[in-house]
Amino acid sequence: MCYNKFMNIRTITTANQIHLENETVLVLGYFDGLHLGHQELFKKARQIADEKGLKVALLTFPESPKLAFVRYQPELLLHLQSPEDRFQKLNELGVDELFLIDFTTDFASKTAKEFVDQFVKALRARVLIAGFDYSFGSDKKTASDLSAYFDGQVGVISPVLDQGEKISSTRIRQAVLEGRVKEAARLLGHPLSSRGIVVHGDARGRTIGYPTANLAPIDRTYLPSDGVYVVDVDFKGQTYRGMAS
C-alpha cells in the first residue's frame, strides 16, 4: 500500500486549535515503529475512508506517553524511527491529517468522556479505529469502551501474529537491542534505519585497505548491540552496500 497525497502535519496544545473541513476516520494510538500490526489499523482506516468519502486523521504524540507516568529513564526518549521516517511512513499509509500533541499531565488528566467530547468531536470523526490494546482517559478505559462514548462506527483491530507471537513495539525494541536486526525488520515490515553525520576518526581502516566512515547519530533511535552488520547506505541520492560495526 502506498498513498502519495500530501499529508498535513499540525502540532497542537488544545482541541480548540483543530479546524477541519471534512469528516474523518480517526486513528488513535502512539505507534512507535509503525510495524505490521500498526499498519493493519491504517489499512482499515484508509479502506473505510475511501468507501465513505472521508479523510484519514491521526491524533498521536511525538514522545512516549509513559513519560507522564513512570520514573524518567533515558531510553524512554528513544524511538524505532526518526520523526521524518515516521511522517513519511504515515503518508504512505494514507493519513491525510496528522495532529501531534504532547502527552502532558494536563492531557493525561482528562477523562474518557472529556477526551471524546473535546478531541474526537473536534476532529470530526465519523469512524474510530484503534488497536485491541488501546487505552484512553484518566479513568483508564479500553478500546472496547469507545462505543460507550462515541455514537459513530468503532473498529478495534485484533493483534497481528508472527510465529504465533504478537507483533509489538516492545518485541521489536528487544530484537534490536539484542542485534536481531533481520527479525526486527521482518516485524516492522520495513528496514531498520538510523541517520548520522560523518565525523573524523582515527583513520585505522585506511591502514588495512578498508577506509571507513564514522557516524555520529543525529536521531534518538534504538541502535543494535555491538556487532558487524550488512547495511545499505543512502548518500547523496545513491544507495551503497556496506558494513557497519
Task: Name what the model sees in each region.
Residues 60-62, 93, 98-106, 158:
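A conserved beta-strand->alpha-helix junction
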Residues 106-211, 226:
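Classical nucleotidyltransferase
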